[in-house]
C-alpha cells in the first residue's frame, strides 16, 4: 500500500497561510520550501524556516499537519551598538550619587539627606559654643601668665661691676686732665700778653715801621737814617703761614744782605718789614688771601691780637695802593749811601720780579683750569688741519679725541663715538666737497624747545 502524502501549512510574508501537500511522507523541509519559493518566484536564500517558533534544519523530515513559517532575513549592519550599551551599563553601575533618585514617598534623596545633616548640626551647636569658650579662656590664661626670666649669669654681673668701676676712674681722669689744660692755657695766654723789655716809644716806632712794604723805593730815606743805628747781630727767622723758610738779613754798616727762598707753588708773596731797629727788617711773606702772619709769630714779636688785626687791615690797603705805583718807573734819588743803596735797590727789584713772575704763572694756571672746567663753552678757534696730509686712519687717531671732535664740528659732521670711529669718519670725507659728503654723516640741527 503506497504511503500517504503529508499535508503541511506554510506561512510567509505576502501570501498568508496556505496548505501544501508534499510528494511523499519522507519529504524534507528543503524540498517543499524550494518548490514553494519557485512557485512564488523568490530566492530561497532570503528566508529561514521556523516551526512552532523555533528554527529547524532544512534537512529534517516534514511532519504531517505542522505549520512552517518562512521568516525573511534582515540585512546585517556594521555593529557596535552593543558595545555602546555595555559601556553605558558600566557607567550606571559605577556611580554612587543617588541624590537625584526618589524614595518610595516621592521625595528626592538630596532633600532627605540635607534635612538629616541640618538636624545633626543643630544638636552639636551647644557643644561647639562650649568648645569655643574653652579655647578663649585658655588663650587668655596664657597671656596673663608672667614670663619666667632668670638672670643668674655670673659673667654678666662681673662685667657690669667692672664697667661701673672703669666709668668712675675715667670720669676722675677726665676732670683732672681738663683742670690741668685750663691752668696751662691761662699760663700760655699770660705769656703771650707779656711785652718784651722795650719802651713804649720803641714799640710804637716798630709798629709804624712794620707798615712799610718792600715793593718799591718808598721809605728808603727812613731806612738809611736808621741803618746807622742798627747793630750787627743776626735777627731770628720769622715763621711763615705758607710754609716758606726766609732767612733774616745781616745788618751792617756797609749794606744789607738777604736770601729768601720762594715756594714752588703759584702763590704770590709780599715781604713785610718787621724789625723795629733797621730798614732791612725781617721779611715775612704775605699772601693775597689776607692771612699775613700767624699768631705764633705775633706772640714772638710781642704783639697783641687786636694790634695784629688792625695792622693786617692797614697792610692790605697799602699793598693795593703800592702795587699800582710799583709798576710806574721810579727815579732814584741822590743820597749819600752810595753802594749800600744801590745794592739794596737791586735786591728789592729782584724781589719784585720774582713776585711778578709768580703772579703771572698763577694767572696762567687759573685761566687754563677755567678753560678745562668749561669745555662746552670753549670757542673753537684753532686752525683746521689739512686732511690731505694724512694717508691713513691710524695717523688721524694720533690727533686725539678732542682734536678730532673739533675738526668734525668745524665740518658740521657728527662728532660722537670712539677714537677709531671719529678718525674713520673724518678720513672718509678727506678731499671731498661739502656737497659730495654723505648726508648721513652730518649732525642733526638742534630743535627749539616746545613751549
UniProtKB/Swiss-Prot annotation:
State a GO cellular component annotated for this protein.
nucleus
Q: Which residues form the propeptide?
A: 1-77
Could you state a single Gene Ontology molecular function term?
Answer: snoRNA binding
Q: Where is this motif: PIP-box?
A: 39-52
Q: Where in the cell is it found?
A: Nucleus; Cytoplasm
Residue intervals of the SAP domain: 396-430
PTM per UniProt? Answer: Upon binding to PCNA, the N-terminal UBL (ubiquitin-like) propeptide is cleaved at Gly-77 by an unidentified deubiquitinating enzyme; the resulting mature SDE2 is degraded by the DCX(DTL) complex in a cell cycle- and DNA damage dependent manner. Both SDE2-UBL and the mature SDE2 are polyubiquitinated.
Residue numbers carrying Phosphothreonine:
274, 319
Positions of region (Disordered)? 182-210, 222-354
- Print the keywords alphabetically: Cell cycle, Cell division, Coiled coil, Cytoplasm, DNA replication, DNA-binding, Mitosis, mRNA processing, mRNA splicing, Nucleus, Phosphoprotein, Ribosome biogenesis, RNA-binding, Ubl conjugation
Q: Where in the chain is the site Cleavage?
A: 77-78
Record GO biological process: cell division; DNA replication; endonucleolytic cleavage of tricistronic rRNA transcript (SSU-rRNA, 5.8S rRNA, LSU-rRNA); mRNA cis splicing, via spliceosome
Q: Name one Pfam family in it.
A: Sde2_N_Ubi_vert
Which residues in this protein are found as Phosphoserine? 266, 278, 326
Q: Compositional bias (Basic and acidic residues) spans?
A: 302-329, 340-354
Q: Which residues form a coiled coil?
A: 109-149
Swiss-Prot/TrEMBL domain comment: The PIP-box (PCNA interacting peptide) motif mediates both the interaction with PCNA and cleavage of the SDE2 precursor by a deubiquitinating enzyme.
- Family to which this protein belongs: Belongs to the SDE2 family.
Reported function: Inhibits translesion DNA synthesis by preventing monoubiquitination of PCNA, this is necessary to counteract damage due to ultraviolet light-induced replication stress. SDE2 is cleaved following PCNA binding, and its complete degradation is necessary to allow S-phase progression following DNA damage. Plays a role in pre-mRNA splicing by facilitating excision of relatively short introns featuring weak 3'-splice sites (ss) and high GC content. May recruit CACTIN to the spliceosome.
Its quaternary organisation is: Interacts (via PIP-box) with PCNA; the interaction is direct and prevents ultraviolet light induced monoubiquitination of PCNA. Interacts with FBL/fibrillarin. Interacts with CACTIN. Interacts with SF3B1. Interacts with U2AF1.
What is the protein's given name? Splicing regulator SDE2
Q: Which organism is it from?
A: Pongo abelii (Sumatran orangutan)
Amino acid at each position: 500500500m503506497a504511503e500517504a502524502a503529508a499535508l503541511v501549512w506554510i506561512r510567509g510574508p505576502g501570501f498568508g497561510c496556505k496548505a501544501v501537500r508534499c510528494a511523499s511522507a519522507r519529504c524534507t523541509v528543503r524540498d517543499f520550501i524550494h518548490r514553494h519559493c519557485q512557485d512564488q518566484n523568490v530566492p530561497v536564500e532570503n528566508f529561514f524556516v521556523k516551526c512552532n517558533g523555533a528554527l529547524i534544519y532544512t534537512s529534517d523530515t516534514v511532519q504531517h499537519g505542522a505549520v512552517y513559517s518562512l521568516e525573511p532575513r534582515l540585512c546585517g549592519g556594521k555593529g557596535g551598538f552593543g558595545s555602546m550599551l555595555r559601556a553605558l551599563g558600566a557607567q550606571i553601575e559605577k556611580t554612587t550619587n543617588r541624590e537625584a533618585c526618589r524614595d518610595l514617598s516621592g521625595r528626592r534623596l538630596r532633600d532627605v539627606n540635607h534635612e538629616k545633616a541640618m538636624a545633626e548640626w543643630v544638636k552639636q551647636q551647644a557643644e561647639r559654643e562650649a568648645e569655643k569658650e574653652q579655647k578663649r579662656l585658655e588663650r587668655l590664661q596664657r597671656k596673663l601668665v608672667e614670663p619666667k626670666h632668670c638672670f643668674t649669669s655670673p659673667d654678666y654681673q662681673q662685667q657690669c661691676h667692672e664697667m661701673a668701676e672703669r666709668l668712675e676712674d675715667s670720669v676722675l681722669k677726665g676732670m683732672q686732665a681738663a683742670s690741668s689744660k685750663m691752668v696751662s692755657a691761662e699760663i700760655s695766654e699770660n705769656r703771650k700778653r707779656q711785652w718784651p723789655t722795650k719802651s713804649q716809644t720803641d714799640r710804637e716806632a716798630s709798629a709804624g715801621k712794620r707798615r712799610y712794604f718792600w715793593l718799591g723805593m718808598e721809605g728808603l730815606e727812613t731806612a738809611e737814617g736808621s741803618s746807622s743805628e742798627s747793630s750787627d747781630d743776626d735777627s731770628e727767622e720769622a715763621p711763615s703761614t705758607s710754609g716758606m723758610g726766609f732767612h733774616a738779613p745781616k745788618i751792617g754798616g756797609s749794606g744789607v744782605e738777604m736770601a729768601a727762598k720762594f715756594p714752588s707753588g703759584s702763590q704770590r708773596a709780599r715781604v713785610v718789614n718787621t724789625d723795629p731797629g733797621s730798614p732791612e727788617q725781617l721779611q715775612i711773606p704775605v699772601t693775597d688771601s689776607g692771612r699775613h702772619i700767624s699768631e705764633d709769630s705775633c706772640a714772638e714779636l710781642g704783639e697783641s691780637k687786636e694790634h695784629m688785626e688792625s695792622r693786617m687791615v692797614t697792610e692790605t690797603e697799602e699793598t693795593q695802593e703800592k702795587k699800582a705805583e710799583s709798576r710806574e718807573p721810579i727815579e732814584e734819588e741822590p743820597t749819600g749811601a752810595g753802594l749800600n743803596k744801590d745794592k739794596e735797590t737791586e735786591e728789592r727789584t729782584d724781589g719784585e720780579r720774582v713776585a711778578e713772575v709768580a703772579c703771572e704763572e698763577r694767572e696762567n694756571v687759573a685761566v687754563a683750569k677755567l678753560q678745562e672746567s668749561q669745555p662746552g663753552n670753549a670757542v673753537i678757534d684753532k686752525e683746521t688741519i689739512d686732511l690731505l696730509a694724512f694717508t691713513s686712519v691710524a695717523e688721524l687717531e694720533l690727533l686725539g679725541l678732542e682734536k678730532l671732535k673739533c675738526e668734525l664740528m668745524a665740518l658740521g659732521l657728527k662728532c660722537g663715538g670712539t677714537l677709531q670711529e671719529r678718525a674713520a669718519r673724518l678720513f672718509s670725507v678727506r678731499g671731498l666737497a661739502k656737497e659730495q659728503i654723505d648726508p648721513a654723516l652730518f649732525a642733526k640741527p638742534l630743535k627749539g624747545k616746545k613751549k
